[in-house]
């Protein structure tokens, strides 16, 4: 197949053997018997080891010896030839394969290549033009006619390929390819390709090939012509513009500027103003430009005295439209309703016959002609403007970066030196006073632009170290009490640390970080004239006439333009506002800025957190703010905070409003130094025991004007478990809300204004023996002498609680005598508390009584003992039924819901048999019961049967059912579903659902 002389597919000499052996063995062995098989089974201990060949070779050899033994014949079908001989390899015939000659491994190449290590000249299969003798590897010395790597046979179409360093004829289309370092012949289309280091192609930094726009490209450090628009850059160490040299450059690149010397003023960068030299009291910081991109030089104006433009679209003192970033230019607002400020524009209503109808619409403005309101809203939505404050960098005139206008900006700063700025709506901006006072003009107010870029304002250049948002400090020219680089996250300087390069200026104090960390030891947190207020609720008191606000809260300004009775309003829908005079203004993040009074300087107040967790154990300085001090947002008082002396302003109290409206404001009633918090409870303890309390007449002469003060004074109802069911009450007998006035309640309401003395609501009730006078002691106190053996208990407060009370009259001789005390006890109701305790308990609104409990209390007040003999008393539940107790019934202190329970078509009275009184007593007496929802229903159709034979059968069933339960049938109303029957005593009466027809 591959050049062999036989038909054997692998070129063997034998026809029948597949691998060229002389016998019919599988792998060229002479025979396949067991004696010659090296892998055949042999007995243990034979002389022939495993794998030894006694006969013919396994792979074509005549004899295969033991491993390592010499062989008598060549294995694998080869004759004993040396390595690299010309005898064919395994299975090869005399006729060579395609394109090869008769050579073993290492012989002549079959595809035109020479043998490895042989020097016999061979012919190329591709018809190359030259056939040189090629020495073996290592036979020729380096640098001979055919060095290492050179080939006598050139590439396709090439005349010859020179070796490394040899100049010879070049390749495709080239006249010659020079060696490494050659100087003449170039490649394809090239005029001249010089060697390495030749002068035709300049080296790096040479002057032949110039850069874009430059005359030549100088070497590193040379002083040749610069690039396009750039100034010549001097070499390192040369005198072109060395450090400290004040030489002006000829011209810079587009928007760039040359670096000025140390302290020298020079032409600034694109749009930035120049930096003056380093002098005492210089306006900017050391080596700092007063404006940034698009702020000063390019298309904006320098602001007035002391005011420095902000780099991020800030508002300065002068309103001018920037050329770069102006309206309908780069960075401007291209659409929406805020292209220009809204101005009321009158338009004629279209589509009406009458032209007198006019309306005002934003679409009528000249800037919005051809657009309706929906289109403007869509444009606003496309720009992400959904109302509220303006977004970052947005200006109402459509100005981009660097526009100085008179509208509020997010990153705006305020001008200095007695200029009235526009009221900023910036949540991140530093607040400045809205007006100047006549006593302390707020000049030298520093302006703090965006993201902590410090700019130093005007008069005498007194710089306050404004803390950067990203932790970078401002300038080197300030005299501050904190080190450079204070961050927003509360790093506090060491005590007495002062940076270098401190210059003139007065009262430079530190500004606080963004998130309100407190300064270190002995740091002054009360700033001077040039101090700005922090952002998020740091407790710093601003200077005279300076008001601080975070999110649009208008605090009380300084003396000149502030109304004494003005009301502060906030940006949160008046949730934090309170109408007060001379009160503190509560900031949303816990900063309280006291209003400045004409007769008192600003006092540092106590900081209040956003959620009312106030300071512990601090003493508030006397001020003319709210009487009880400032309260937290959620009406939590300052724990153990005692006002200092002098806090005795008598004025109308101002309750601090609650932002969520869930809890009423605290009443502040005091005319002298007393407690700070009234006796008011919140939560479950302040809930009334009943839904509809008894109408107790309260007509005090001196009471609190606050409604809450009067409401908590209402007495509560007691629960008497002695004569009720086993239900566990919510308020037990000992858990009533005491209505005893606390020590800080200066005005106590009186039950009866005609009384001769003021006494608490919970009066002392005692029982005295019949006809036994009780003399008064010398100190005017009554003795607690009791002779009838009644149970009594003395509480800690000295009050005696006994039952039943008796009416006590005072004689002229100063003794008290009991009139009408008997064994049963007569209930006297001289006060509303006693009447309330006699009323039956009815908590759920679904239950009702006839007469109502309010009517019972009114009749008991007029006629004592009325509740013991209520005629035809009715108790019921709406939608379930009612019970009419015949005759007179004693309803005093009954918990009706524990005794009477209505369910669907069922009523139970005294379910607990152990609590049931004998027949005729309590509610276990004759009564007429009416159950509702007793209707004759057809089970198949689900309709109500109103007449017919089926209704008569249903009525007969009700009569039979009443008789079975010991009741007497009275009537049945099929329309209303009322079943009325009479009982002599009470148990459980019901009608199940199985009695429907």
From Swiss-Prot:
Residues 1-144, 293-552, 714-744, 758-836 are annotated as: Disordered. Belongs to the nucleoporin GLFG family. It comes from Arabidopsis thaliana (Mouse-ear cress). Keywords: mRNA transport, Nuclear pore complex, Nucleus, Protein transport, Repeat, Translocation, Transport. Residues 371-388, 760-771, 814-825 have a biased composition (Basic and acidic residues). One of its GO terms (molecular function) is structural constituent of nuclear pore. SUPFAM superfamilies: C-terminal autoproteolytic domain of nucleoporin nup98. Part of the nuclear pore complex (NPC). The NPC has an eight-fold symmetrical structure comprising a central transport channel and two rings, the cytoplasmic and nuclear rings, to which eight filaments are attached. The cytoplasmic filaments have loose ends, while the nuclear filaments are joined in a distal ring, forming a nuclear basket. NPCs are highly dynamic in configuration and composition, and can be devided in 3 subcomplexes, the NUP62 subcomplex, the NUP107-160 subcomplex and the NUP93 subcomplex, containing approximately 30 different nucleoporin proteins. Pfam families: Nucleoporin2. Its main location: nucleus. This is Nuclear pore complex protein NUP98B. It is found in: Nucleus, Nuclear pore complex. Residues 844-986 form the Peptidase S59 domain. GO terms for biological process: cellular response to hypoxia; mRNA transport; photoperiodism, flowering; protein transport. The keyword Zinc-finger does not apply.
């Amino acid at each position: 197949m591959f050049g062999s002389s036989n038909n054997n597919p692998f070129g063997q000499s034998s026809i029948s053997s597949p691998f060229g052996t002389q016998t019919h063995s599988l792998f060229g062995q002479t025979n396949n018997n067991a004696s010659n098989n090296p892998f055949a089974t042999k007995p243990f201990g034979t002389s022939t080891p495993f794998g030894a060949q006694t006969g013919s070779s396994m792979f074509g050899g005549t004899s295969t010896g033991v491993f390592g033994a010499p062989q008598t014949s060549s294995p694998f079908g080869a004759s004993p030839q040396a390595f690299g001989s010309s005898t064919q390899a395994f299975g090869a015939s005399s006729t060579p394969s395609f394109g090869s000659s008769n050579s073993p491994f290492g012989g002549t190449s079959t595809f035109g290549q020479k043998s490895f290590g042989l020097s016999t000249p061979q012919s190329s299969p591709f018809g190359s033009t030259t056939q040189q003798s090629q020495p073996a590897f290592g036979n020729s010395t380096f640098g001979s006619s055919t060095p290492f790597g050179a080939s006598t046979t050139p590439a396709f179409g090439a005349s010859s390929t020179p070796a490394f360093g040899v100049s010879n004829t070049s390749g495709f289309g080239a006249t010659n390819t020079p060696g490494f370092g050659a100087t003449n012949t170039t490649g394809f289309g090239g005029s001249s390709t010089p060697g390495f280091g030749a002068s035709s192609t300049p080296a790096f930094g040479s002057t032949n090939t110039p850069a874009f726009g430059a005359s030549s490209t100088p070497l590193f450090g040379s002083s040749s012509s610069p690039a396009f628009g750039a100034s010549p850059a001097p070499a390192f160490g040369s005198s072109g513009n060395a450090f400290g040299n004040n030489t002006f450059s000829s011209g810079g690149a587009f928007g760039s500027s040359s670096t000025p010397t140390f302290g020298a003023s020079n032409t600034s960068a694109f749009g930035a103003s120049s930096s003056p030299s380093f002098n005492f009291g210089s306006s900017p910081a050391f080596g700092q430009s007063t404006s940034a991109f698009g702020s000063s030089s390019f298309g904006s104006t320098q602001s007035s005295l002391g005011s420095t433009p902000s780099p991020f679209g800030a508002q300065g003192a002068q309103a001018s439209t920037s050329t770069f970033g102006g309206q309908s230019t780069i960075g401007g607002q291209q659409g929406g309703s805020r292209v220009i400020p809204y101005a009321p524009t009158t338009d004629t209503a279209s589509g009406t016959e009458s032209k007198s109808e006019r309306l005002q619409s934003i679409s009528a403005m000249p800037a919005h002609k051809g657009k309706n309101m929906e289109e403007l809203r869509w444009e606003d939505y496309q720009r992400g403007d959904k109302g509220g404050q303006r977004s970052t960098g947005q200006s109402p005139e459509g100005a981009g970066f660097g526009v100085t206008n008179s509208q509020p900006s997010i990153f705006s700063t305020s001008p200095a030196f007695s200029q009235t700025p526009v009221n900023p709506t910036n949540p991140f901006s530093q607040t400045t006073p809205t007006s100047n006072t006549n006593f302390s003009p707020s000049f030298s107010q520093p302006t703090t632009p965006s993201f902590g870029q410090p700019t130093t304002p005007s008069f005498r250049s007194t710089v306050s170290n404004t803390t950067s948002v990203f932790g970078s400090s401002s300038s080197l020219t300030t005299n501050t009490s904190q080190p450079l680089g204070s961050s927003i996250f509360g790093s506090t300087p060491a005590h007495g640390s002062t940076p270098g390069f401190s210059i003139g200026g007065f009262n430079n104090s530190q500004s606080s970080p963004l998130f309100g960390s407190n300064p270190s030891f002995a740091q002054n947190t009360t700033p001077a004239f040039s101090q700005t207020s922090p952002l998020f609720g740091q407790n710093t008191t601003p200077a005279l006439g300076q008001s601080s606000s975070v999110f649009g809260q208008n605090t009380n300004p300084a003396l000149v333009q502030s109304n004494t009775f003005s009301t502060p309003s906030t940006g949160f829908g008046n949730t934090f506002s309170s109408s007060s005079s001379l009160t503190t203004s509560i900031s949303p993040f816990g900063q309280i800025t006291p209003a400045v009074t004409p007769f008192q300087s600003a006092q540092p107040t106590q900081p209040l957190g956003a959620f009312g967790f106030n300071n512990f154990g601090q003493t508030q300085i006397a001020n003319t703010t709210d009487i009880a001090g400032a309260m937290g947002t959620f009406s939590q008082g300052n724990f153990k905070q005692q006002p200092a002396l002098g806090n005795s302003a008598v004025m109308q109290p101002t309750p601090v409003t609650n932002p969520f409206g869930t809890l009423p404001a605290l009443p502040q009633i005091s005319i002298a130094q007393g407690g700070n918090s009234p006796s008011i409870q919140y939560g479950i303890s302040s809930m009334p025991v009943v839904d509809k309390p008894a109408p107790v007449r309260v007509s005090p002469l001196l009471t609190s004007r606050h409604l809450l003060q009067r409401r908590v004074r209402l007495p509560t109802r007691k629960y008497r478990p002695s004569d009720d069911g086993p239900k566990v009450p919510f308020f037990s007998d000992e858990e009533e809300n005491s209505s005893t006035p606390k020590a800080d309640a200066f005005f106590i309401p009186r039950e009866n204004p005609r009384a001769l003395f003021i006494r608490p609501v919970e009066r002392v009730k005692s029982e005295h023996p019949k006809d036994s006078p009780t003399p008064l002691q010398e100190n005017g106190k009554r003795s607690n002498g009791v002779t009838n053996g009644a149970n009594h208990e003395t509480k800690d407060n000295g009050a005696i609680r006994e039952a039943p009370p008796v009416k006590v009259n005072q004689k002229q001789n100063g003794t008290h005598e009991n009139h009408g005390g008997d064994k049963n006890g007569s209930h006297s109701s001289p006060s509303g508390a006693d009447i309330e305790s006699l009323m039956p308990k009815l908590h759920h609104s679904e239950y009702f009584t006839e007469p109502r409990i309010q009517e019972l209390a009114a009749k008991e007040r007029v006629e004592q003992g009325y509740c013991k003999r209520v005629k035809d008393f009715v108790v019921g539940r709406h939608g379930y039924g009612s019970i009419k107790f015949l005759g007179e019934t004693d309803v005093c202190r009954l918990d009706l819901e524990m005794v009477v329970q209505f369910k669907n078509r069922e009523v139970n009275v005294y379910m607990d048999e152990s609590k049931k009184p004998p027949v005729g007593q309590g509610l276990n007496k004759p009564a007429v019961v009416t159950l509702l929802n007793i209707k004759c229903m057809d089970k198949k159709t689900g309709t109500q049967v109103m007449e017919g034979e089926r209704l008569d059968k249903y009525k007969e069933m009700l009569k039979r059912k009443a008789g079975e339960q010991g009741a007497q049938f009275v009537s049945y109303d099929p329309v209303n579903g009322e079943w009325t029957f009479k009982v002599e005593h009470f148990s459980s009466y019901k009608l199940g659902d199985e009695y429907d027809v």
